[in-house]
């Protein structure tokens, strides 16, 4: 693995509200009990309202509390709200919440700021947890600049290419075992119009750092581009970044879905489900929805690794994980909860009581050797595991990076920068401006951020 330059970015206390990468896992709001600080034999947990989280909430009292005697007070909020509340409580080190759900975007930043309790000693003293069973890229993405572990994944995802194998067979098309983007563009052109109203591919064009910029940044990486070099020089107007962006914009304009500039994860999911596109590059978590029992495309799909050009792999990495606040007055009890929620036993519990399709997968190697899970996810589980294991959060491109991240740059400012840049590129997808014009503006935005970090 290439040695990465990991300079220490400027500490900021305010975290911008984030977009979503795990769009299929979002649901409505429910707020549970949360006190002004945990005490006695209880802990306070602040978490996002994704379905798998609320399922955990329902199972906690009858299993975790019954086994340990520790009561868990949950506060459950929508994603943007929970991110805001977590950043406020953890930045102030108020200690109101012992545990919170954080992604691999926030955890290294929070660790750098001193807001999180390290988990190394807990892992070492808890052999039953089996930290080595956690997929290596997940462990890497939840490790701080100091090499210490600050989070444990609850579930995770990467990205890959989904395609209609029946349509490909009808058209005499073959998906390469390890496709390049050049090959994918050729296949998209040939599959375009394969059936009435069917387009060749669906790619996100909806503005958002976690919408359009997620897949596009993986394309930039494998084309040889980067947002910033190791010295914090902005490179959005570099030949590689420009080539990748023009490729992406041209592909989606020529052979992509209608209304691409307003299409995010949800819209592409609908297009794929309804047979309106022959291919879709997006989150591995989408496969479970496409292969659901009532899905009209169940059994009709094939899966391939994220397309590449100059790199060996290109898939992104994202996880909802658990972090323990440094100011927690109950870190030992907090670890017991984290160990239970992210442990092998909890996955077995969910599989036995709710169903294996509901298991919070994407984090442990043992999940993918479990016969019950393998049967449930036979169509895509091997490709999903391979995608996650091949993700390189510290070395996603062809050059050293100043901060970790594949589909994002691991600095607090990226949520705002990424969203603004995505708006410019989405306008190019819509035909309102050229890619060159979009990236000229974007370079200026990135240079302002770069000045904050240069020389550090």
Predicted feature descriptions by range:
Residues 2, 71, 169, 392-456:
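Conserved C-terminal helix/tail region of periplasmic/extracytoplasmic solute-binding proteins
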Residues 63-134, 169-172, 271, 275-279, ...:
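Extracytoplasmic "Venus flytrap"/periplasmic binding protein-like
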Residues 88, 96-100, 128-167, 199, ...:
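A structural signal for short loop-to-beta-strand junctions that line the ligand-binding cleft
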Residues 104-158, 212-215, 298-304, 385-392, ...:
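Hinge/lid segment of periplasmic solute-binding proteins
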Residues 120-134, 177, 201, 205-206, ...:
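Short, solvent-exposed loop/beta-turn-alpha elements that line the ligand-binding surface or hinge
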Residues 124, 286-297, 310-320, 324-419:
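C-terminal lobe and pocket-closing loops
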Residues 143-154, 159, 182-234, 246, ...:
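Extracytoplasmic/periplasmic solute-binding protein
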Residues 187-190, 231-262, 302, 306:
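Glycine-centered hinge/linker elements that transmit conformational signals in sensory
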């Amino acid at each position: 693995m290439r040695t990465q330059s990991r300079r220490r970015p400027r500490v900021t206390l305010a975290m911008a509200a984030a977009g979503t990468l795990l769009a299929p896992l979002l649901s409505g709001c429910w707020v549970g009990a949360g006190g002004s600080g945990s005490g006695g034999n209880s802990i306070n947990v602040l978490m996002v309202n994704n379905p798998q989280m609320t399922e955990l909430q329902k199972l906690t009292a009858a299993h975790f509390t019954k086994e340990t005697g520790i009561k868990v007070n949950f506060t459950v909020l929508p994603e943007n709200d929970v991110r805001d509340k977590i950043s406020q409580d953890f930045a102030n080190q108020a200690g109101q919440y012992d545990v919170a759900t954080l992604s691999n975007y926030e955890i290294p930043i929070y660790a750098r700021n001193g807001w999180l309790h390290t988990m190394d000693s807990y892992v070492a003293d808890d052999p039953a947890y089996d930290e080595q069973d956690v997929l290596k890229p997940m462990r890497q993405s939840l490790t701080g600049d100091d090499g210490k572990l600050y989070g444990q994944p609850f579930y995770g995802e990467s990205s890959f290419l989904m395609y209609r194998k029946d349509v490909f067979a009808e058209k005499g098309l073959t998906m390469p075992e390890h496709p390049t983007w050049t090959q994918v563009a050729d296949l998209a052109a040939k599959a375009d119009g394969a059936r009435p109203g069917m387009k060749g591919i669906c790619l996100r064009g909806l503005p958002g750092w976690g919408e359009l910029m997620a897949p596009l940044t993986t394309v930039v990486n494998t084309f040889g581009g980067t947002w910033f070099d190791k010295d914090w020089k902005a490179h959005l107007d570099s030949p590689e970044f420009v080539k990748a962006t023009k490729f992406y914009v041209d592909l989606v304009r020529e052979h992509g879905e209608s209304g691409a500039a307003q299409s995010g994860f949800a819209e592409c999911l609908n297009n794929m489900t309804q047979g309106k596109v022959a291919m879709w590059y997006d989150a591995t978590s989408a496969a479970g929805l496409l292969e659901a029992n009532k899905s009209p495309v169940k059994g009709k799909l094939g899966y391939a690794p994220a397309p590449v050009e100059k790199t060996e792999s290109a898939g992104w990495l994202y996880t909802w994980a658990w972090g323990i606040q440094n100011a927690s007055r109950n870190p030992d009890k907090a670890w017991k909860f984290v160990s239970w929620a992210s442990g092998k036993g909890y996955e077995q519990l969910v599989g036995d009581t709710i169903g294996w399709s509901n298991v919070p997968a994407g984090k442990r190697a043992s999940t993918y050797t479990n016969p019950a899970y393998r049967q449930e996810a036979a169509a895509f589980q091997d490709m999903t595991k391979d995608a996650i294991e091949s993700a390189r959060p510290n070395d996603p491109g062809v050059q050293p990076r100043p901060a970790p991240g594949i589909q994002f740059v691991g600095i607090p400012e990226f949520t705002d920068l990424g969203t603004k840049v995505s708006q410019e590129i989405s306008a190019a997808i819509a035909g309102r401006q050229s890619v060159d014009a979009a990236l000229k503006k974007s370079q200026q935005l990135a240079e302002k951020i770069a000045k904050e970090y240069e020389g550090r």
